[in-house]
């Protein structure tokens, strides 16, 4: 079963099929591509001190969800964004890379192409994630879920609305992926929460 568990020696074990791992890798690459747009300060001096030349909410709705305004008042929001957006993007990139890099190490080249002849998509990957990386995974999974939720316009009635869709509707599959990411977040958060009683692996 895919997900995370705490081994008896305290290590965090991640388990995914090749197919699930490839999907997560693809999602992180989409997040990285999105975060790479429009963040380079025009002034080299601003780049040195980490100040962005951007002071407005991104036009892309997903990017706006990932990098929201901190204040309702436009002037305050713009000023805060200039001083924080660059570092916020860098942190989110680091979270995405933490997921992508370990998947790249464990998937192997043959598993990166889901159409490769003879590939067993259900074959499981097992790898250890450090406590530090696990926290980065938690944040990265959240960014993926926010991105999908924004694209799908997920609201309070989402479960009923998407359940009513036919299996042929691509939005239903994307919503199932959205729900799966939420489940992964929940499991990992439980493992990282002190005094919790997560599923324990040998």
Regions found by a protein language model. Name each.
Residues 1-128, 132-202:
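Charged, alpha-helix-forming regions
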